[in-house]
């Protein structure tokens, strides 16, 4: 038996063990254990189905090879073997994909944070442009986008946008967007036609619950103040705006989009938890990087990952040396799969 067949046999054995355990009175009466084992079985269900089919194909190949000695059945066995070998190859490809370790955050919703960096107003305008592209992509994927917080600049762009994106596999596809995005284009206000370079940062933070990130209330500094509008004008006569600082890490979140102090505090706390969880992920990735051939990217906000060159209609993905000359089409259609699919394929190849 090959190493792959042995591995698949052990997976099937575990699946059958879990089936038996889940029907036992002891497990049924223990909700925590029942949930834990159900989750484990669900995580190996797809690979178990493929394993059963693969082992069956191996058995059929073995039987047909034995029939090659039979003069009457040898031709039929040869034809059957051709079909079985193709099926075996296809199943091996699919199984290798299924055996790649799954990121536990892949099924989570995310907080998407875009922030203007170098380049002044032009950076803020690109924050809006890239956010629209993400919204179009979310629409294609049937995801829901909810703006949690936004801060506009004076020329119709944004200093910062934070949005909650909900749907199937959101984190699995957008996690590679974290980092610095550089844009090169001629601003509308540029009379000399000179190309300006500006940059924005993108953060992708999995939505987390209280179990995943526990915060001690004594570690929080909560400040309230009056919400300010454009140009410093006061938009609220009560102290509804909230700033929460996590003292051990000095991570701070301000929120003033809601009229209610309670709602602003609730939103700020959720984003703070997401940022703390993001920090945990970054630290874990750095620790794991030593054991990996190469990472697609660390997810560090300071890492320059992509350049959008409008005069050349060029999108350059620096982590995998991908260049596409369809920038405007991608931005207008929101079809980011042209970039995301190669990134996912590259990440998966590191486990092969």
Curated annotation (Swiss-Prot):
One CC-aspect GO term: cytoplasm
Pfam families recorded: PCRF, RF-1
KW DNA damage (keyword) present: no
Superkingdom classification of source: Bacteria
PTM annotation, UniProt: Methylated by PrmC. Methylation increases the termination efficiency of RF1.
Keywords attached to this entry: Cytoplasm, Methylation, Protein biosynthesis
Modification sites for N5-methylglutamine: 233
UniProt cross-references to SMART domains, sorted A to Z: PCRF
Stretches for region Disordered: 288-309
InterPro entries assigned: PCRF, Pep_chain_release_fac_I, Pep_chain_release_fac_I_sf, Prokaryotic/Mito_RF, RF-1
Record field: compositional bias (Basic and acidic residues): 289-306
Location(s) in or outside the cell: Cytoplasm
SUPFAM superfamilies, per database record: Release factor
GO molecular function: translation release factor activity, codon specific
Purpose of the protein: Peptide chain release factor 1 directs the termination of translation in response to the peptide chain termination codons UAG and UAA.
UniProt similarity note: Belongs to the prokaryotic/mitochondrial release factor family.
Protein name from the UniProt record: Peptide chain release factor 1
Annotated source species: Helicobacter pylori (strain Shi470)
Higher taxonomy: Bacteria, Pseudomonadati, Campylobacterota, Epsilonproteobacteria, Campylobacterales
């Amino acid at each position: 038996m090959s190493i792959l067949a042995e591995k698949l046999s052990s997976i099937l054995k575990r699946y059958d063990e879990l089936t038996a355990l889940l029907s036992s009175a002891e497990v049924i009466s223990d909700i925590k254990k029942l949930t834990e084992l159900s989750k484990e079985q669900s995580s190996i269900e797809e690979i178990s189905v493929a394993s059963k089919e693969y082992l069956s194909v191996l058995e059929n190949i073995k039987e047909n090879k034995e029939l090659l000695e039979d003069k009457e059945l040898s031709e039929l066995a040869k034809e059957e073997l051709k079909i079985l070998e193709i099926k075996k190859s296809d199943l091996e490809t699919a199984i290798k994909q299924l055996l790649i370790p799954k990121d536990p955050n892949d099924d989570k919703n995310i907080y998407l944070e875009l922030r203007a960096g170098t380049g002044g107003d032009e950076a803020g305008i690109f924050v809006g442009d890239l956010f629209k592209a993400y919204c179009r992509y979310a629409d294609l994927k049937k995801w829901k986008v909810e703006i949690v917080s936004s801060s506009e600049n004076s020329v119709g762009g944004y200093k910062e946008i934070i949005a909650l994106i909900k749907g199937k596999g959101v984190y699995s596809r957008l996690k590679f967007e974290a980092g610095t995005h550089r844009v090169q284009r001629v601003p509308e206000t540029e009379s000399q036609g000179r190309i300006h370079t500006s940059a924005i940062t993108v953060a992708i933070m999995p939505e987390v619950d209280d179990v995943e990130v526990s915060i001690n209330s004594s570690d929080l500094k909560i400040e309230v103040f009056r919400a300010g509008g454009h140009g410093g004008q006061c938009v609220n006569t009560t102290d509804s705006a909230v700033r929460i600082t996590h003292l051990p890490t000095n991570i701070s979140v301000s929120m003033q989009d809601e009229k209610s102090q309670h709602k602003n505090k609730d939103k700020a706390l959720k984003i703070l938890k997401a940022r703390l969880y993001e920090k945990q992920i970054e630290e874990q990735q750095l620790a794991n990087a030593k054991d990996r051939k190469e990472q697609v990217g660390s997810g560090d906000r300071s890492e320059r990952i992509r350049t959008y060159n409008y005069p050349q209609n060029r999108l350059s993905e620096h982590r995998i040396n991908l260049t596409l000359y369809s920038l405007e089409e991608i931005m207008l259609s929101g079809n980011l799969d042209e970039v995301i699919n190669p990134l996912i394929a590259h990440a998966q190849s590191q486990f092969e």
